[in-house]
């Protein structure tokens, strides 16, 4: 019980005529406290969603870096293969086919 509710209870006890007003004020305080709890819950949910979003952004960034790295590795393997193959059989591969670039 809050200090305001305690004071209202004393007022209700000593002054029965104002009891209805005190009850209305108590109901207002209860509704206010309920709304504060709801807002706290929403605030916590929002913070959790923000954290989830940041985690997902980080995961996407890591996956993107992995994909770029893998793509570059594959291109390097292809270039190495073409370079070695061209040295052995240059008549089978034209210059335009041996041109792979790194992804940035």
UniProtKB/Swiss-Prot annotation:
| Residues forming coiled coils | 24-69
- Keywords associated with the record: Coiled coil
Query: Which InterPro entries is this protein grouped with?
Result: AH/BAR_dom_sf
- Protein name (database record): Uncharacterized protein L583
